[in-house]
């Protein structure tokens, strides 16, 4: 069961993977949810905002009732501003969708929600979603480390651009994804339109909280070794 804290969904994916597909689903459709969406930049989304709720932080209310803003400060300050706008305007915020940059490892961002007291008090991680580019993933993983990190930390994986590759290549991509992360659910975005239930209310992150604890332990061990402690 989720607590009274506001659930947070993190969306990751390498450059051009198709995160915008999921974000536009939230910002453009009449789904009845009040979701605060923190994105990289408005230019990639191409949505029309309705009301300016906070000029300084550039927080907008969309036609479907969702809030949208870009990450101009650190995560905690941005979400404090969203909560302030929520209280001042009497707006519901059912959940938060946080888009990482294409080159970001989602693990440190997830750790921030756990380790920063304000965020841990008001928010709870629901799931980390990663979008995988079926056409370019095999090439990307041989030249960059981030795509594998994004897949490895995912609670759920959305495969994009399946229609752009043949079945043999797609099978190789799935095998590679599974070798990196054998536990995450995989959904093909080309098989059917994504629905809100595919993205939210999954309650998957704390089912695998162990990964965060292991990362924290590893970080502490590396610090001790660097300082000459045992």
Task: Please identify what each model-predicted range represents.
Residues 2-12, 17-140:
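Nucleotide-state-sensitive switch-loop elements of NTP-binding domains
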Residues 138-153, 157:
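Flexible active-site lid/hinge loop adjacent to a nucleotide/diphosphate
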Residues 36-38, 92-97, 123-132, 151-162, ...:
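Conserved beta-strand/loop subsegment of P-loop NTPase cores
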Residues 27, 99, 148, 174-177:
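Short amphipathic alpha-helical segments and helix-helix/interface helices
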């Amino acid at each position: 069961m989720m607590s009274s804290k506001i659930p947070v969904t993190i969306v990751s994916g390498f450059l051009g993977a198709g995160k915008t597909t999921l974000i536009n689903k939230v910002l453009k459709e009449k789904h009845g949810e009040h979701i605060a969406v923190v994105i990289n930049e408005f230019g990639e989304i191409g949505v029309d905002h309705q009301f300016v709720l906070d000029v300084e932080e550039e927080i907008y209310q969309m036609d479907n009732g969702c809030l949208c803003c870009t990450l101009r400060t650190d995560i905690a300050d941005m979400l404090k501003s969203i909560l302030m706008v929520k209280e001042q305007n009497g707006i519901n915020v059912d959940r938060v969708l946080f888009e990482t940059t294409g080159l970001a490892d989602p693990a440190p961002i997830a750790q921030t929600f756990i380790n920063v007291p304000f965020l841990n008090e008001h928010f709870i991680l629901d799931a980390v979603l990663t979008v995988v580019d079926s056409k370019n993933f095999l090439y990307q993983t041989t030249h960059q480390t981030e795509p594998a990190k994004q897949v490895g930390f995912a609670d759920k994986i959305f495969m994009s651009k399946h229609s752009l590759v043949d079945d043999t290549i797609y099978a190789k991509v799935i095998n590679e994804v599974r070798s990196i992360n054998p536990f995450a659910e995989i959904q093909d975005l080309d098989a059917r339109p994504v629905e809100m239930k595919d993205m939210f209310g999954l309650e998957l992150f704390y089912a695998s909280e162990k990964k965060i604890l292991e990362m924290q332990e590893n970080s502490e061990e590396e610090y001790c070794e660097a300082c000459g402690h045992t």
